[in-house]
A protein has these predicted regions:
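Short, well-ordered beta-to-alpha junction loops that form the rim of enzyme active sites
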Residues: 9-10, 43, 109-113, 130-132
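Glycine/Thr-rich phosphate-binding loops of Rossmann-like dinucleotide-binding domains
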Residues: 14-15, 117, 136, 143
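Short N-terminal targeting/anchoring amphipathic segment
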Residues: 97-115, 125-127
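N-terminal subdomain of nucleotide-sugar transferases
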Residues: 1-59, 102
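Short, well-ordered alpha-helical microsegments
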Residues: 46-49, 111-118
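Acceptor-binding helix/loop patch of EC 2.4 sugar-transfer enzymes
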Residues: 66-83, 128-156
């Protein structure tokens, strides 16, 4: 039995569930048949353990307040990183993962923006689950938004 940590920048404990949430929950449920699964994620709402979450051994939710999100987004812009990396960044979550990395055989990063939490000098296996990889959906959104809409430039 391997010990697996799932890292998500999306709140997997909130409802209603979206496609990305459902996908990683299905993956974790399947993996929990022969492995011990823990979860860390960013979120605002902390729900009590529901039936669809019972396959997680432990889960920890990190809250990021609005001012921290704005400051992190500014730092991301200055470092020429995607703005969403700053929006979904938690120093506490980064520290938690770094402190506990040696307890896990595998770390799965759910969504591309979660890869920023990859701990340095981690010797185990890592998996990047790319539900939100740049795809035709993003291309369709970019084409449908006006050039004058600032949201269009967040997708680049």
């Amino acid at each position: 039995m391997q010990k697996i940590l799932i890292v998500s920048s999306k709140n997997l404990l909130s409802q209603p569930f979206e496609g990305a949430q459902k996908r990683i929950l299905d993956i974790s449920k399947f993996l929990s048949k022969k492995n011990q699964i823990d979860l860390v994620c960013i979120g605002e709402n902390i729900l009590k353990k529901k039936d669809n979450l019972k396959h997680f051994n432990h889960f920890k939710v990190f809250r990021v307040n609005f001012i921290s999100k704005i400051i992190n987004m500014i730092f991301s812009l200055l470092k020429l990183e995607p703005v969403q990396n700053g929006y979904f960044f938690s120093k506490e979550m980064l520290n938690y993962i770094d402190e506990n990395k040696d307890s896990y055989d595998i770390i799965i990063f759910h969504l591309v923006r979660s890869a920023q939490y990859l701990p340095k000098e981690y010797r185990g296996k890592t998996i990047l689950e790319m539900t939100d990889l740049m795809s035709a959906n993003y291309d369709q959104i970019i084409k449908s938004i006006s050039l004058f809409n600032p949201i269009k430039y967040l997708y680049f």
